[in-house]
Every structure is written in structure tokens, then in C-alpha cells.
């Protein structure tokens, strides 16, 4: 697991390239013993505009006050159902009440909350949206990626979400085409993300769709990801990973100049951005066949989501084997 010191080095290097928005995800970030300190330290760095968190919210209620004091800007809660029995079936633990308490605690603390729900054929879109509206939080429905169960359990997001909600609440407002209910430019996502947002009559919240397959947004994707062990993934749907913290970056040596460390990491980030492919390769069955898909959520959160792929392409920072795929465009859209 990355130390706070290493995380801060990565963030400092990223800000040098113009990257200003940072999100802590997982696994489960609330398990990190120094999460509050990490958020606070990141927020104090020059060039950082926002720090957000994505969590299953099981432990959120006990963390909200400290996160608020640390300066967290927003929290996304992963919640695929509000039915207690179905939640227990999905997670193997009866912890829906803990999640709801966490959401309520965050809202009471004045933290902006959004709900993320992964779509399956069983997803009760109307119930989840009603719950979000009651809480005053935006909700985003995320298309399941074709990994593991996603190969056979996915659904077409637009028809599943917009179709179901339209039957109950009428056509969404803020549309600009006759054939497809796309929101107007001024209602596009202000959160620098891939979601398309829709507004339904009588709702004071936005309903978002994130469609990696049916609404491919690769040409505007501005995300790169760092794993808990310091590897960098330019794209979730690619077999390319990069060594972000090479041996030349000695974090045990306090005498090593931070600027020198930042410079090495910044070069790795540049290489990763240049290596970001034009589009994902989820259609490549050979590349994305998981050897194992393990998931478990428990009260102590001792386990976390893990997917191991059969094929990966490792790019060492010291080798700088970046694939120059429209590098100028990538640097521009990500911040450099």
C-alpha cells in the first residue's frame, strides 16, 4: 500500500503537468489508516483544485467529520440496490443500514454526495432514483464492463435507465434531439467526468449515465489511475500498465531532493498519458479474460475487489516504452 509520502509525491508531480482534480478510490479507501491525513495533505498542495472519495460507505459514518475537517470536496457512494435482502445477496453482508447511515452523516456534514450504481438486469432504477431524490443527491448508473460476470450480465444503459424513468416521470427535460434524449451543452457534466446527465420533471437531482460500451467516451476521457502498489493504468480497458515508482526514486532516503523525486514521477506520468490508447479494448476477448474475480464486503472490510488478468503489458519507467498515440491530444485533455 502506498504511504502518504509516496501519494504526495505523485500528486505534486501530477500538478506540475496541470492535473488538478484527484479522487481516492479502492478497494476501499476508508481502510487506509492515514486517510484523513492524506486528504488534508493533498488539499494543501499548490495546484490541487479538488480531492474526492469513492467508497462503499460501510465505514463512512465514523469518518465523515474527520473527512470534512480534512477538506474533502465530495464523496461518491457505490450502492447498487436499496433493498436490504438484495444488498445482502450482492455483498454477502447485511450492512445496508451502515451504508445509509454513512450517506446521511456525509450529507449532514455538508459534504456533496453522489450515488453510483452498476447496472444489471435486476437493477431497480426507479427505486434507486427515488432514494437519491429523497436524499437530494445526484445518481449515476454505470454500465457494467465486460469483465467476469459483465460478459453475460450487462444491459443497455440508456434503455434501462431513461426508458424506465420516462415511463414513470415522463420525458427528461433539457433535450436537444428528436431521436435521442441528449442533454444540452450547458447541462453537460461539470465534474470533469464521463457521465451524461438528464433531468426529469419533479426531480431536483441529476440522473447520470456512464456508458463505457454503448456510449463510448474514450475520445474525451481525461482519467489516469494509480494502483495501491504504485502502478499506473492509462486505461481500464487496456493491457498497458506502467511502473510509476522506479527504483531510482528512493523514498526511504529523506536526503533525496523531493524535486528530484517529483521530476522522475512526472516523467512517468507523461509517458503514461502518451501511452493512453485512443479507445479501450473491451472487445478483445484475449486481453480481458480475468483469471479470477474476487469480491467481498464485510464489517471490517478485510477484503477488496480484485481482478487478475491473463495478459498485461508492463512498461517500466526506466525503459520509457511509451506508445505515442496522439500524445498532444492526450496531454491537452488531461491537463498538461
Regions found by a protein language model. Name each.
Residues 215-336:
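Radical SAM enzyme core and accessory elements
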Residues 1-24, 28-142:
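Radical SAM/AdoMet-radical enzyme domain recognition
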Residues 4, 96, 155, 259, ...:
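Electropositive phosphate-/nucleotide-binding environments in soluble metabolic enzymes
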Residues 60, 122, 148, 216, ...:
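Flexible, glycine-rich phosphate/dinucleotide-binding loops
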Residues 27, 58, 203-205, 231:
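Well-ordered beta-strand scaffold positions
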Residues 80, 85-88, 93-208, 212, ...:
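Radical SAM enzyme [4Fe-4S]-AdoMet core and its adjacent flexible, acidic
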Amino acid at each position: 500500500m502506498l504511504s502518504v509520502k509516496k501519494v504526495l509525491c505523485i500528486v505534486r508531480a501530477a500538478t506540475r503537468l496541470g492535473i488538478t482534480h484527484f479522487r481516492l478510490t479502492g478497494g476501499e479507501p476508508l481502510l487506509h489508516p492515514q486517510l484523513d491525513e492524506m486528504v488534508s495533505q493533498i488539499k494543501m498542495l499548490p495546484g490541487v483544485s479538488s480531492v474526492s472519495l469513492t467508497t462503499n460507505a460501510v465505514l463512512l459514518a465514523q469518518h465523515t467529520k474527520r473527512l470534512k475537517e480534512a477538506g474533502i470536496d465530495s464523496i461518491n457512494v457505490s450502492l447498487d440496490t436499496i433493498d436490504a435482502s438484495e444488498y445482502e445477496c450482492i455483498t454477502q453482508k447485511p450492512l445496508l443500514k451502515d451504508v445509509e447511515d454513512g450517506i446521511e452523516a456525509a450529507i449532514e456534514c455538508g459534504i456533496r454526495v453522489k450515488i453510483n450504481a452498476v447496472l444489471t438486469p435486476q437493477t431497480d432504477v426507479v427505486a434507486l432514483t427515488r432514494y437519491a431524490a429523497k436524499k437530494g443527491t445526484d445518481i449515476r448508473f454505470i454500465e457494467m464492463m465486460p469483465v467476469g460476470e459483465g460478459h453475460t450480465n450487462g444491459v443497455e444503459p440508456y434503455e434501462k435507465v431513461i426508458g424506465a424513468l420516462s415511463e414513470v416521470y415522463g420525458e427528461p427535460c433539457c433535450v436537444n434531439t428528436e431521436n435521442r434524449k441528449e442533454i444540452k451543452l450547458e447541462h453537460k457534466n461539470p465534474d470533469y467526468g464521463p457521465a451524461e446527465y438528464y433531468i426529469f420533471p419533479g426531480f431536483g437531482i441529476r440522473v447520470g449515465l456512464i456508458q463505457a460500451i454503448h456510449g463510448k467516451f474514450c475520445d474525451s476521457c481525461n482519467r489516469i489511475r494509480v494502483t495501491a502498489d504504485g502502478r499506473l493504468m492509462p486505461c481500464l480497458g487496456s493491457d498497458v500498465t506502467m511502473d510509476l515508482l522506479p527504483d531510482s526514486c528512493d523514498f526511504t532516503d529523506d536526503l533525496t531532493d523531493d524535486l528530484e523525486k517529483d521530476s522522475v514521477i512526472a516523467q512517468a506520468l507523461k509517458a503514461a498519458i502518451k501511452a493512453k490508447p485512443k479507445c479501450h479494448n473491451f472487445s478483445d476477448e484475449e486481453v480481458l479474460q480475468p483469471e479470477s474475480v474476487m469480491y467481498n464486503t464485510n464489517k471490517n472490510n478485510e477484503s477488496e475487489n480484485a481482478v487478475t488478468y491473463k495478459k498485461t503489458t508492463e512498461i517500466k519507467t526506466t525503459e520509457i516504452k511509451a506508445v505515442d498515440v496522439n500524445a498532444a491530444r492526450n496531454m491537452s485533455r488531461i491537463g498538461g
